[in-house]
């Protein structure tokens, strides 16, 4: 485990000691090397977990998320270069240090064995994210967005700490590896219902569940590009990962308690997709589409069948790469047009044909076209929910149609139509941006050749 944690920690002093003209080159190449080392975790034998020590372990659920986390740091650094070109070197170094610190905390969160340690790290990821949003965001509303983000997540996860201390007292351990054998079945008495809610609410807010999702569009819209990328790609996955880990302790209460939340998710999935059709702000549209995709993951985790778990894991990885790519594309538009409003940036296909190709591929990945891993995840979730209840197919089908509609709407609004006069003399697409898009899309396509490495612990 230390072969990733120590190099990531040493990224911080390396950034601080780099010469001003070498900051980006050093940090990007070094973080790419770290992400290549982390690939060794994917090749695990059967369903066994790699127990690195008493503190860290990795199994087939956390390994794909771990690799996604490390893979995202070089991409975030590549995406942030022109956004930070006006800043002083010390500010750039601080920014990279924040991203590295965030990656370090996320790696430790995904591999922690103790639930209390998981909780502390889960909360600690708020701090660098908050600093990134409130310091480098574009508009003045970023402070408001940061407050929303902080308080939603904190208030949601405080009861979790109380619940964890209670479980520690009753079972005597909070170690993931031991507690699955020691956990006593939880019946549906009133006290256990509150215990269930306390355990799940933190992750429901983080996912986010429809109704608790108001912080997400705000935080996404106001964050700088790297903030949006890491928020969409990894921080939302913390919720899904935590839910999968903690449902082991909460059976059989989950079977009764899951119904209202599944209804809310299925309804919210259709609602947020419909909200996407009415958006004028590009980043806001992508943020709402994230909510609708993560609602599928909530449904899958609460169904608790092997298929739904596999679908949830695959969908989390796929959504991480897809939404991150869409945010990068939105950012490349923003850097040229200096507005997130879609009407002001229409007709870009005639000026930037290669970017239009990336837009098309990203939109197709977002609506789960066959060769991508998105399809595998969505197919598993839809089939699992259909076998749970036949009625869900109505909502799932509606959601899939609306997803196709808003993806088409996004593509037509930004790429087609008559271009406006103020974008005649914009910059061409850089090699850096094309490489960034390719590095997002390649894993999505290559994983479909061998999807079992992202299908989680049950496969």
Curated annotation (Swiss-Prot):
Superkingdom field = Eukaryota
* One record GO biological process: electron transport coupled proton transport
Keywords linked to the UniProt accession: Electron transport, Membrane, Mitochondrion, Mitochondrion inner membrane, NAD, Respiratory chain, Translocase, Transmembrane, Transmembrane helix, Transport, Ubiquinone
| Protein's UniProt name | NADH-ubiquinone oxidoreductase chain 4
Q: Which InterPro entries match?
A: NADH4_N, NADH_Q_OxRdtase_chainM/4, NADH_UbQ_OxRdtase, ND/Mrp_TM
Q: What does this protein do?
A: Core subunit of the mitochondrial membrane respiratory chain NADH dehydrogenase (Complex I) which catalyzes electron transfer from NADH through the respiratory chain, using ubiquinone as an electron acceptor. Essential for the catalytic activity and assembly of complex I.
User: Mitochondrion as a keyword?
Assistant: yes
Species, as recorded: Felis catus (Cat)
Its cellular-component GO annotations read: mitochondrial inner membrane; respiratory chain complex I
GO MF terms, alphabetically ordered = NADH dehydrogenase (ubiquinone) activity; ubiquinone binding
Q: EC number(s) of the enzyme?
A: 7.1.1.2
Tell where it localizes. Answer: Mitochondrion inner membrane
Where are the bilayer-spanning segments?
22-42, 60-80, 92-112, 113-133, 147-167, 193-213, 224-244, 257-277, 284-303, 308-330, 351-371, 393-413, 435-455
Give the quaternary structure: Core subunit of respiratory chain NADH dehydrogenase (Complex I) which is composed of 45 different subunits.
Q: Name one Pfam family in it.
A: Proton_antipo_M
Give the family this protein belongs to, as stated in its UniProt record: Belongs to the complex I subunit 4 family.
Ligase in keyword set: no
Known catalytic reactions: a ubiquinone + NADH + 5 H(+)(in) = a ubiquinol + NAD(+) + 4 H(+)(out)
